[in-house]
Amino acid sequence: FFMATDNESGLTDYFANAGGGGLRYETAKFKGFQFGVSGFYIFNLGSSDLTKKDSATNQLSRYELGLFDIQNPENKNDINRLEEFYLKYHFRKSYLQFGKFLLNSPLINLQDGRMRPSVVEGIWTELFPGKLLKIEGGFLYNFSPRSTTKWYSGVKSIGLYPSGVQPGGMQSNYYNNLNSNGT
């Protein structure tokens, strides 16, 4: 995946070229049970210096860095993550899943991370009690957002990305400033 940002004069231009691949294994259903595991790796095949902040904004490249690991801009070679590791139980047309897995729901989706999606850890179910009714929900306690390699609790996963500013011009600064009774 290649991308480049050509900014206006006075701002830094960036480019990045990423390559990667993944392995995934999912068993056939056995008495309703199914196991899955997957991992993904990314390599920086060539880029501008993604550790260099723009002199005018004092910010790193937002988009090009997102191809790799936003938490570790220096890492160009060891960008890998165990993405899925789950046990799933199928019953009727429904299922119950536990572990690390990809989730597409009205609230959380795979998102376009270009090189890797967001992944969740917890327990999740989709129930189909009737032809026109679908119920889904669960308890998610860890997240590995797109463009990262590590796992974070719910409150620690919010604010990892560069954020906007408040109406008065101050940084929003969600990261490490949220509390929750959950995760």
Predicted regions and their residues:
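Transmembrane beta-barrel strands of outer-membrane/channel proteins
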Residues: 1, 37-41, 98-100, 137-141
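Surface-exposed strand-loop-strand hairpins of Gram-negative outer-membrane beta-barrel proteins
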Residues: 2-18, 54
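Extracellular loop and loop/strand-boundary signature of outer-membrane beta-barrel proteins
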Residues: 7-11, 70-73, 108-111, 176-178
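Signature for the C-terminal beta-barrel architecture of outer-membrane proteins
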Residues: 16, 114-183
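Membrane-embedded beta-strand positions in outer-membrane beta-barrel channels/transporters
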Residues: 20-22, 83-86, 122-124, 183
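Structural signature of outer-membrane beta-barrel channels/translocons
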Residues: 26-28, 88-92, 126-130, 183
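Repeated loop/turn-to-beta-strand initiation elements of outer-membrane beta-barrel proteins
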Residues: 32-35, 93-97, 132-135
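Surface-exposed extracellular loop regions of Gram-negative outer-membrane beta-barrel proteins
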Residues: 88-103
